[in-house]
A protein has these predicted regions:
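Charged, glycine-rich active-site and insertion segments that engage polyanionic ligands
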Residues: 1-65, 69-85, 89-152
Length: 152
């Protein structure tokens, strides 16, 4: 499973096999994304503030993981669940896929990519992250019906 979660980063997979705290950090980053998607504006801005206090490399890593997770949700929405990378998050990914559509996910992916580029170019990190938080779609709306399940 670590090889898949590493996303081609052999060094990370080897490090994670030796240091379980890397997996805990990964879970914390994904929990932050869940907070952003499920939270209101105030919660999102607090998260942006906390994330902005990290070093640029940590922010880039976090946003990269967010991209990977959002990509997996998009794959499920588009009917390709077998291609997801974050298999340890499959239940969460499927739940998000029932609440978001392809357009929302593509917009979220573009917003994360833009924030990542802005952080890399030393633009005001906190402002870039706040804009990202405003652009993420909410997943607190009622779940869409699962297309694989027949209607009752």
């Amino acid at each position: 499973m670590l090889a898949g979660l590493a996303g081609g980063r052999v060094g990370w997979a080897l490090d994670a096999a030796q240091d379980p705290s890397l997996l805990e950090q990964r879970q914390a980053v994904l929990a932050a994304l869940a907070q952003a998607l499920n939270g209101g504006t105030v919660k999102r801005f607090r998260l942006a503030e906390a994330l902005a206090g990290s070093d640029p490399e940590a922010i880039d890593d976090a946003l990269g993981l967010w991209l990977s997770w959002l990509r997996d949700v998009l794959l499920v929405v588009e009917g390709c669940p077998e291609r997801i990378v974050n298999r340890d998050q499959q239940a969460e990914i499927e739940a998000a896929a029932r609440q978001l559509d392809s357009r929302d996910l593509q917009a979220a992916i573009r917003a994360v990519q833009a924030a990542r580029a802005q952080v890399a170019s030393a633009i005001n990190t906190r402002m870039a992250l706040e804009v990202l938080m405003l652009r993420l779609p909410p997943v607190t709306s009622p779940a869409r019906p699962d297309p694989a399940r027949p209607a009752r």
